[in-house]
């Protein structure tokens, strides 16, 4: 006898309801996966294999050739991005909404910086005319960017496509930060003229920064500080108060002073967390400043490095009262993300040095990548004509130069740039704490 199962009206209805639920869940999962894929694509870190560049940077002129090439590649991608609609740009950056006012502000700043860098890089065109084109102003630079193309039979042909990919990804990094600013603060823009970024340095001048330390004894911090002394250069180590106290407790104040001998030590707060939406952000900075000045009076520099670049838009007066300056950066190694290798980190930094020609280079002394990347940079740039800034005179040198340039009859005590007139003035900085430590 064959037994047949027939669904009752109730069971059939329940089945259809479950069918709809499962279908909705599958659609939701699919949408999430697509969103994650889009975010992963737009969130790719810009890297490049420097071996595709055919010449060692063994003279200042060859540094300039590579610099001019990188400037043109990036300028071409910047120009191309301006042809995108707001919707297309949002999709490319993986964002729902864009702050186009800040995006356009940053684009204009980028053009101005690229033009300044081009004028510096073209000084050696008589010695080597590679990538030399006539550029008298920003509109002409935009025209050259539109015309830019590396011929298939060029000596530099292997470099062209990887360079364009790097430039587009790096531009995405900058425009994404711009699109979120000032709601989410970052290093892409300053809130006032007291804040530093590294753009203030002279051409071919760079300062190494190591942050998030110190490590436990005999860790990466020790290795890097020793290496700096061996190379007869110095760097600014931005320390976390909690880690500094732990290092003191496990060793001694004398050992700490030996660790940072000849180096500079700035502040990064008590913990590595956003100082934009932490109720205890002021106490975090004050506690770290007090401890650092007590333990390392000869190394202390009055600079605060905000974790993730996050700080409050209304914090300027606090920092003035504390006699501190916010120190941002313009060359991010991305070594703290855990997503690129030490070699990729080194190649990325060198490429950005060619593009920006000056600035603060940020590494983390809590990872082992800087131990490989920094020596590689030193070796590959030894004859390039660059110089490493002395951390002891930065930014005091800038302050002295500003005092010399100021009008003699200027007696106003009002702080400059309470809020910059050329950028959005409100910041809620509502972003959640980043999931990864690093810039």
Write out the residue ranges for each language-model feature:
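Metal-dependent polysaccharide deacetylase catalytic core of the NodB/CE4 family, i.e.
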Residues: 138, 142-144, 150, 154-158, ...
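Alpha-helical, coiled-coil/dimerization segments enriched in small aliphatic residues
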Residues: 211-212
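Histidine/acidic-residue-rich catalytic or RNA/ligand-binding cores of hydrolases
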Residues: 277-280, 339-343, 371-376, 402-403
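Short, composition-biased local secondary-structure segments
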Residues: 182-199, 275-293, 346-349
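Terminal accessory/targeting
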Residues: 2-5, 15-17, 22-30, 37-208, ...
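A short, acidic, amphipathic alpha-helical segment used as a generic capping/interface helix at domain edges
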Residues: 342-354
């Amino acid at each position: 006898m064959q037994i047949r199962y027939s669904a009752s009206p109730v069971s059939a209805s329940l089945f259809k309801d479950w069918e709809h639920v499962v279908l909705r869940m599958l659609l939701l999962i699919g949408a999430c996966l697509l969103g994650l894929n889009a975010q992963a694509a737009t969130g790719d870190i810009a890297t490049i294999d420097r071996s595709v560049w055919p010449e060692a940077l063994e003279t200042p002129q060859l540094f300039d050739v590579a610099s001019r090439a990188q400037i043109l590649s990036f300028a071409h991608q910047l120009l191309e991005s301006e042809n995108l609609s707001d919707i297309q740009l949002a999709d490319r950056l993986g964002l729902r909404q864009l702050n186009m006012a800040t995006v356009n502000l940053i684009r204009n700043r980028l053009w101005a910086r690229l033009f300044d860098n081009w004028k510096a890089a073209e000084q050696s065109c008589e010695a080597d005319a590679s990538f030399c084109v006539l550029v008298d102003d920003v509109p002409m630079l935009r025209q050259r960017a539109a015309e830019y193309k590396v011929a298939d039979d060029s000596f530099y042909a292997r470099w062209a496509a990887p360079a364009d990919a790097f430039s587009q990804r790096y531009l995405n990094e900058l425009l994404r930060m711009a699109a979120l600013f000032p709601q989410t603060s970052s290093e892409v823009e300053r809130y006032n003229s007291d804040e530093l970024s590294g753009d203030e340095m002279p051409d071919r001048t760079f300062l190494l920064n190591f942050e998030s330390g110190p490590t436990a004894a005999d860790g990466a911090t020790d290795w890097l500080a020793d290496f700096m002394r061996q190379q007869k250069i110095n760097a600014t180590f931005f320390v976390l108060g909690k880690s500094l106290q732990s290092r003191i407790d496990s060793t001694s104040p004398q050992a700490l002073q030996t660790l940072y001998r000849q180096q500079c030590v700035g502040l990064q707060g008590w913990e590595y967390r956003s100082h934009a939406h932490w109720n205890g952000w002021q106490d975090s900075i004050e506690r770290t400043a007090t401890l650092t000045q007590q333990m390392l009076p000869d190394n202390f520099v009055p600079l605060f490095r905000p974790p993730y670049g996050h700080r409050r838009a209304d914090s300027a007066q606090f920092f003035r009262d504390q006699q501190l300056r916010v120190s941002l950066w313009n060359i991010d190694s991305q070594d703290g993300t855990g997503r690129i290798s030490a070699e990729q980190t080194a190649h990325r930094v060198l490429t950005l040095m060619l593009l920006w020609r000056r600035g603060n280079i940020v590494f983390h002394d809590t990872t082992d990548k800087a131990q490989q990347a920094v020596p590689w940079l030193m070796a590959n740039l030894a004859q390039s004509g660059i110089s490493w800034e002395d951390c002891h005179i930065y930014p005091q040198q800038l302050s002295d130069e500003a005092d010399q340039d100021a009008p003699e009859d200027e007696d106003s005590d009002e702080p400059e740039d309470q809020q910059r007139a050329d950028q959005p003035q409100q910041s809620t900085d509502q972003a959640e704490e980043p999931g990864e430590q690093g810039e």
